[in-house]
């Protein structure tokens, strides 16, 4: 059972997967993480909202009835952009104290940190609350993976605390911006 990972090496491995969205193609990256987490004792389930657009949920049951700590992030990245890169965007090249690659900060290093933390928690505190990792596809173009999971009955479950690894200029936050879609219908007399 694997219980430790080198977070930098895991970041570099994740950067080697081209998950630029569109088209996304997160399945291989999700399966790579799923295997690592299964080896660490987690139960892993995969959810596709489209072909090769795979999200995953990995769970480690706790030893009591408290809700688990949950970690969440996304597997896809934004496009490379018009400017050419000085380093291969899929190499995970390390230069000094920086690692370069598409998605390094948003958010493959965050996912590597979450996986490393979850595996350490599992190893060092096995009798405590459970751990759930939720890694979604399609965040960069409308959060389709998260919407898919939210639409499935009783897939996500409860969480005692949620850690979202989106970059926030290295400041821990208790809240973060998001989006909300509303449809409102009113009746009455039109006037101004």
Annotate each language-model stretch with its function:
Residues 1-2, 45, 183-191:
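Metal-dependent amide/peptide-bond hydrolase catalytic core
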Residues 1-81:
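N-terminal helical capping/dimerization or prosegment-like subdomains
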Residues 11-14, 93-98, 186-192:
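A short small-residue
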Residues 47-50, 103-107, 138:
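Active-site nucleophile and cofactor-binding loops and adjacent substrate-binding regions
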Residues 66-132:
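Active-site metal-coordination/substrate-binding segment of hydrolases
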Residues 69-71, 163, 189:
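Residue-level marker for buried hydrophobic side chains located in beta-strands
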Residues 74, 176, 192:
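Histidine-centered active-site/metal-ligand motif
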Residues 107-181, 185:
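Acidic/histidine-rich catalytic neighborhood of metal-dependent amide-processing enzymes
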């Amino acid at each position: 059972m694997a219980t430790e990972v080198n977070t930098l090496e895991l970041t570099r491995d994740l950067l080697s997967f081209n998950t630029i969205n569109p088209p996304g193609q997160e399945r291989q990256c999700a399966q790579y993480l799923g295997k690592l987490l299964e080896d660490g004792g987690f139960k892993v389930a995969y959810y596709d909202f489209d072909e090769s657009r795979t999200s995953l949920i990995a769970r480690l049951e706790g030893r009591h009835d408290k809700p688990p700590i949950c970690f969440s992030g996304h597997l896809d990245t934004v496009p490379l952009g018009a400017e050419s890169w000085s380093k291969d965007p899929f190499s995970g090249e390390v230069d000094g104290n920086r690692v370069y690659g598409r998605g390094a900060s948003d958010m493959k290093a965050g996912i590597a940190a979450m996986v490393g933390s979850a595996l350490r928690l599992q190893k060092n505190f096995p009798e405590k609350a459970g751990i759930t990792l939720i890694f979604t596809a399609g965040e960069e173009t409308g959060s389709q993976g998260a919407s898919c999971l939210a639409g499935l009955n009783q897939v996500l479950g409860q969480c005692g605390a949620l850690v979202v690894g989106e970059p926030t200029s290295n400041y821990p936050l208790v809240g973060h911006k998001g989006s909300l879609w509303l449809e409102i219908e009113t009746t009455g007399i039109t006037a101004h």
